[in-house]
């Protein structure tokens, strides 16, 4: 473990995904770059990631984007965590699916907040 690549920990906030729909992806990148000096890595035309303190990214694909920022937790065992979410009263709204870099699922907590959990 080094300062650049800290060890991931199950159940800890790991990633923040924010919507960038309606043609705002380039404007958001320009804004955060200009205002805060952020840099970005593009993963195709609809996703751009940042690593500025807490890693995160902007989702421009309306079919994939949440309406609000999406906190993303990390899990070493995605299926076990999905069962724990359901057993605790959460509702899975997107079952486990693959994406570049891993797999994840989305859930809604009892207050209606959507979050996701991912694993490598």
Go through the PLM ranges and name each one.
Residues 1-29, 69-71:
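N-terminal beta-strand motif that seeds the catalytic metal site of vicinal oxygen chelate
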Residues 2-6, 19, 34, 39, ...:
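Charge-dense, helix-prone N-terminal extensions
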Residues 14, 47-48, 69-71, 103-105:
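Short beta-strand micro-motifs in enzyme catalytic cores
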Residues 15, 20, 31, 36-39, ...:
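Tryptophan-centric aromatic hotspots in well-structured domains and transmembrane helices
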Residues 15, 57-59, 75, 84:
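Residue-level hotspots at or immediately adjacent to binding/recognition sites across diverse folds
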Residues 23-34, 105, 114:
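Conserved active-site alpha-helix within GNAT-family acetyltransferase domains
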Residues 36-69, 114-119:
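Conserved short beta-strand elements that form part of the metal-binding/catalytic scaffold
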Residues 72-114:
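Vicinal oxygen chelate
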